[in-house]
């Protein structure tokens, strides 16, 4: 039971990290495109 919960927790952490990175990358590209 705890193993499944741990796996789900790790999956959520990875999902959050990837989402945060993608959001930052998109925001950076948006900033660069409007800065020129």
UniProtKB/Swiss-Prot annotation:
Induction: Expressed at low levels in stationary phase (at protein level). This is Protein YnfP. It comes from Escherichia coli (strain K12). The gene is ynfP.
């Amino acid at each position: 039971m705890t193993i499944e919960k741990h796996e789900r927790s790790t999956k959520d952490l990875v999902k959050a990290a990837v989402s945060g990175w993608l959001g930052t990358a998109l925001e950076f590209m948006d900033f660069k495109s409007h800065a020129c």
